[in-house]
Amino acid sequence: MKNKKKIKNKISYSLLERELMGSRENEIAPEDCASFLSRITYSWTQKMLIYGYFNTLQLKDVPDLPESIKVENTTPILDEFKFKKNEKFGLVWFIYKRFVMVRHKTSIIVQIFSAIVSVLSPLCLRAFILYVQREPSEKSFLVGLFYAVLVLMGALFLSISLQHTYWYTMKCGLEVKGALTSKIYSKTLKLSNYGKRLYSSGTILNLISSDCQNFADYFWIDYLILLVAPIQIIALLALLCWTIGYSGLVGFLIMILSLPLSTFLSSKVSKYQLLSLKYSDKRCNLISEMINGIYLLKLYNWELFFINRIEKQRKQQLINLYKRMAFWALDKMVVQISSALVLVSSFTVYTLIANKSITYEVAFTSISIFSNLREPCELLPQAIQRLLSLLPSSDRICKFLYETSEIIENLSTITTTNGTNQDILITNGTFDWNDNNKNINVGVDSQENKNDDDDMIELVNNDSIETTTSYVLDDINFIAPAGKLTIICGVVGSGKSSLINGLIGEIYKVSGQVTIPNTVSFTNQQPFLVNSTLRENILFGLPMDMDRYKKVLESCSLLTDLQSMPGKDLTEIGERGINLSGGQKQRINLARALYSNSDCYILDEPLSAVDPQVATHLFNHCIQGELMNNKTRILVTHQLQFIPSADHIVVLENGILTQGTYQELKDKFDFESIMKTKKLNLELNNSNNNNNNNNNKEEEEDVENLEKEQQQQVINVNDVISNEFESKNDELNSKLLVNEERETGSVELNIYKMYIKYGSSFIFFFTMIMMYIISQLLFLLFDYWLTIWSDEKKNKNGTKGDSFYILYYLLLVGLFSVFLGIRYFMILHFTNSSSKNLHDKLLKSIGYASCQFFDINSSGRINNRFTKDIAEVDLILMVLSDALYCGSTVLVAVLMMIVINPLIVFPFLLLALFYYLVQKLYRSSSLELKRLENISRSPIFSILSESFNGLITIRSFRQQSRFIKRMQDSINVNLRLFYYNFSAHRWIGIKIEIISSAAVFLSAFFSLFNSNTGLSVLAVTTSLSLTGYLNWCIRQYIEFSMKMSSVERIENYINQPREGDTMNVDMELESNLPINWPQKGEIQFKNVEIKYRPNLKPSLKNISFDIKSNEKIGIVGKSGSGKSTTMLALFRMIECSKGSIHIDGIDISKISLSKLRNSIGICPQEPFIFSGTIRKNIDPFGIYSDSEIWLALEKVKLKETISLLPMKIDTIIHEQANLSFGQKQLLCLTRVLLKSPKLVFFDEHSSSIDYFTAHQLNISVKENITNSTTLTIAHRIDTIIDSDRILVIDSGELIEIFDKNNINNNINNQNSKFKKFVQHTSDHFKNY
């Protein structure tokens, strides 16, 4: 037998997703071909369990899911339900009718059989008790054996029927969960922009992870309890009255009186669960925002701000969670104390009022009836509680699915035509970002929101933040001629994005008509990339056409980039393209559209993030090239040098369209006001004209050189495409995301120790365990006291009356209640502290993790820790409490049985050995299945996150079905792992029930030879309790181990190295730095080499340069050359592998990251806007006054726009708010102006702004950042032409550096890289 040691096994969830889409698909599920006996004993799971004992279970070792559970077969059932608001009861009732009554009638039959057995089993016990009371002369061994077997069969049938009830209802719960999850995802793909503002990705994530799970929990057994338990209670009550007469009614009355209290407590549990979910939603939204914007948060040094925001929501969640658990504990106490009071009250009336004597058959038959009665009476309030807890979840799901449907029905309806001969038209079109012109308050309406802008989320409601009341586009007429190029231009916030969103149906059409071709490809300004290979991002679900694919790579200028990638076109792209430059993202985005071969292409700013040379190539060879030339093309751009090449031009200004050809528009006033950019470039053109060295011959040579480069690229196109023999090796070499670590074997003891320390201390924990043991010992003493009482009445030699025994019984109940309260208080405090500390540590660990951590771990994987794993930890109290409760009960019961019948210890040892072997066989596989299940959730979250961010792209390419299939496959994987894990539960459940029943039989058998009737009966009744508790014990122990595997996964992330851990901060040096460091702003790069990963080539190669105080530096180079890497190195987002960087003579590796990043200003290429007020987005720490904020907004030309908003700078905006890309960049620039740092880095800050606005901003920067050192990365020559010096970077090397006095010399230098950069920017302006 192989010993399983603690090892680490790595599973890539992306690989997991692929593997599970097709693994074992055609295999028949073992359940479907199992024999009757195998189905009864669940032996069809045994092959997997045995294999899992000797080997670590992998996904391929788990059989396929039965067809009946697969989501593609269950989701259509939900399509029959018409989702409406306030239909929370309607959805639950529909699932009853369509899932339970149609698909799972067997579960009801099995539960009814179980209820019948629960009524008959006390009669079997009564017959046995009557037999053991007989005189020895009246006893027969065979008759006694018959009664012992009778007791055995009652216990066995009851246990086995319960196991099958659990299994059938589990299947129902899984079907419901899978169907709802798939339905929610399908509706997510239909969310409009308005819908995305109503429901963030975090909210939808919570619907899937929490609310769908609540449905699964309820439809696992609870719905049957509500159906069968009332009938079962009535039958048992009748049997109780037959046994002890009306005295039983007194006990039942107390039980009934406890139900309203229990129901009240359950309602409180439901109330605080709802509040807890509310704050959980907000926490998840903030965490999603933090993860999505983590790079910019680090650049701004805002991690602490976001951590504090999240902790604020977590604190509120924990307060409500604590109250929920407190009421849950009170409910449990009421049930347990009332069960004791039920007995004492019944026997009090029976003896003192009815004047009858307590006998063994009366006492223990009544105990057995009350025990069987206790279960439905306990489960019924729990089922009601779960139903009450389910209703808020049902309401949330119904509201989402209803409102989503409403949103989609109100989306603009467009007329589609086949072919490319039809003009694209908007006729009298009026559009609004709010569906059906719904009003969304842009201010803070409630007092709650006034006090806390995190109690979100009110949104800005249009294309730009300029307009708050009117339609964004009103009564417009638009035409894009068929087969022609139409260019749309206009200043920031003019309505360009609204227009193209109106064309593709992504904005609400109030009136008018839109006509558009049948197939449309759309490229968003913010590229949508999925975590897959570069090839798959371009193909995007379409079959491979190699000839077209090669032409697309060439047309989109991707050949040079692919040559430098380790896996060529099979290089893995991280989420949101984290391992690509902005230009590379845009070109892959463009390549996807070009490959699709659509009738129409709508391109939103595809040229903004690339250098001029690449932009020219893209325009000439892609937009005007062979593959797209005869198609209808609509290009939104600020690159006005391309306007003369357009067949049709549309100018937008404040939502008003002016359109026509270039010749028709160039003399019009409105057009000229937009085209002021021409004047910005006169200086550059004059500079070129004044140098006669640029003659025609040299220009022809430049063009000839470019053509030669392009020809060389065509020749080498095959070198960047992996063939079938290279693909596996290339995919392995190009892998970005690391495999998700999966522990195997038992959860390490250190994890338990760590969890105990987070909760309190070892002394506290072991004291808590003792409270459980003592309270359960007191509970079993109730029965022992009844034995003494009955024994005295039987022998009639006692001197004490019934009042004495009743008084002491009440004393035992009082003591039991005290210890019960203490144990629940202790476990409540313990688990709450553990949950709080784990989340706090996880949050700080993720917040301060290195950038590389986010490069190699998907957002779905990280979100999984904060959603499902934290939810598991939050609810660990219930499992731990039950584990300690049943464990202590089993311990005390076994000890009592051994004391009564010492000889029973020998067969018990054999049963214990069998028990150990069975649970070991089960536990090995069960833990691995649970770990695989945990990992299998990550693809679900990742697909949801990806899809939410790329809804417009997915819809425009009509890829909804493919993404739904991906999601359904991932859901099936998750259900499949849970299904086999749960079926394994039932396998061990049957085995343990056999062990328990054997223990009952042994107790009964040995009791036949025991002269003490009272102790004999006590031993049998105690053994009967084992039939439930022994199985429950192992189940709760495994469940607790599984919960601890979530703790284990969280701990793995907590132990991740933090950013900057590898560097030695000189605290003395940092403490001596002036508060306003750096005071000069001098920068030195000394032989700097940067590698993104150790196994990759350097992205910066031995770069050295010095920058003086207050110097203005421009950095240029083609896309992917290393410009942004220079910025990342300065902020220590990536540590130098060689060399060093100094600021004001200080080695930046010797100071803390917080100090460094707080001292540098940044205006990033991709702006970051989070949910909150405009004020918070500009000044998150509340450092600046209103007047300072308004002055900064005035400098970036946003003051007038924001002053029109009802709440001004206190207007709440959202991550999905329809601020234009340019407006977001202006807000980022406002942050820099407010901060006024000595050192500022501008990374393509004007790339998505029109030239006129960019020119104004450049003037503003020059006027307001005069005493600072600035480094500016730009593709626009006018942005950096006034720099003191210009650095030219190519392929990670600094190839040129010169001051502004030598600019003309470099422009005229034939071999200068800078010349090519300028040439491609300025050539088209010569036509003006």
UniProtKB/Swiss-Prot annotation:
SMART domains: AAA
Pfam annotation, one family: ABC_tran
Residue stretches making up the ABC transmembrane type-1 domain: 104-389, 765-1046
InterPro entries documented for this protein: AAA+_ATPase, ABC1_TM_dom, ABC1_TM_sf, ABC_transporter-like_ATP-bd, ABC_transporter-like_CS, ABC_transporter_C-like, ABCC_6TM_D1, ABCC_6TM_D2
An individual GO BP term: sorocarp development
Protein's membrane topology: Multi-pass membrane protein
Compartment list: Membrane
One GO MF term: ATPase-coupled transmembrane transporter activity
Membrane-spanning parts: 112-132, 140-160, 224-244, 245-265, 287-307, 333-353, 762-782, 802-822, 894-914, 988-1008, 1014-1034
Name assigned to this protein: ABC transporter C family member 7
Native organism: Dictyostelium discoideum (Social amoeba)
